[in-house]
Amino acid sequence: MKKVSYQIVITVLTIFLSALTASSQVCVDCHKNNTPNIVSDWQLSKHSKNEVACSTCHGDEHNSSTNVELAKIPTPDKCSECHDDKVEQYKKGKHALAWAAMKAMPTAHMQPMALMEGMKGCGGCHKIGMKTESEIKELKKQGAGFGVASCDACHTRHTFSVQEAKQPQACQTCHMGFDHPQWEMYSSSKHGVRYLLKQNKTLPENTAAPTCQTCHMQEGNHEVRTAWGFLAVRLPLPDDKQWADDRVTILQALNVLDPDGKPTPRLDIVKAADVARLTQEDWQKERDKMVKTCNQCHSANFAKGELEKGDNMIKEADRLMAEAIRTVAGLYKDGVIKKAKSYTYNFPDLLTFHDAPTEIEQKLFVMFLEHRMRTFQGTFHANPDYALWYGWSEMQRSLTEIKNLAVEMREKTKKRK
């Protein structure tokens, strides 16, 4: 009886796999002519070796050039059917919230559609975030229904390679440039140089050389998060009174606190997007994880000391940033700058970015999003040149320009009176 049952199972499985193979072959035969590199990529992938057919991810409704719209575009939930643990980790981390964080920016709706939903600007990287079914439907209506899978931001289609996603270059497309040049910092730091020399075989294969993933995805954990978050602000406030005052000023300029220091509705958005650690316990958890990672090559005391230098550079950068913000806020208070219609408060709003309404606020935004970022990111990424010349030095120059421009604006206002 057991022998008969076993034979039935084998027969059913054989029929199923044969049907799966036949179904895939139909797709392959057509797409070899229309999109041949998709086919060759899939054939190189582990998917093709493990009977993960085209229909497994795209469904079987699309079967000709006349009904292309019926091809389903995979989402993380589809990937979770086989990779449940990794998708669950991803959903708990910051990457899953990237799309929501982009949409939450106060002037996101003012940007060209091609840059946002069209994924040629902000959306091109923030597409890694989770999207609702209604958002995906709307994207399709706008002709931008591709690239919603999230996982393929790192495991690019149609090879979906784990080895590719383990390389630091997998992070390079998004973690570079104006406000987050982590690639430039990492690749020219000793950490990055050692790994790149390891890649080109100058250094032996077993050389210790960390990648982005070594530090930020320990043991392959997809729940990516950092202690200081993207903007290097957190709660609770520090014991140091000056630093606490400076951080409050920055939180006010982010409109997370109002000019009186009271929480605003934007704080709820910050909480939902998990862009900052809001308890000491949450911050310490991430710090301890990082120290453990560093401890693979360095003593724990050395690692803690180096990370504390990063904390101290945030403190120093906040001193300059807060002074610049207060200078501009004073112009609002004294009526030199009139509140823009789109503004909630009579106070600068750093999250309006390049849509800031005055020249001095444009300088303030660049000081915050470019120069302050490079000051602390350069320190944490072990890149002295970025921390100093691209960060701290530029902050000093920006502060001087802002203070001088504020004096000019006040003088012009006096003359008009």
Language model region names:
Residues 9-19:
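Bacterial N-terminal signal peptides
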Residues 21-417:
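Short sequence/structural segments immediately N-terminal
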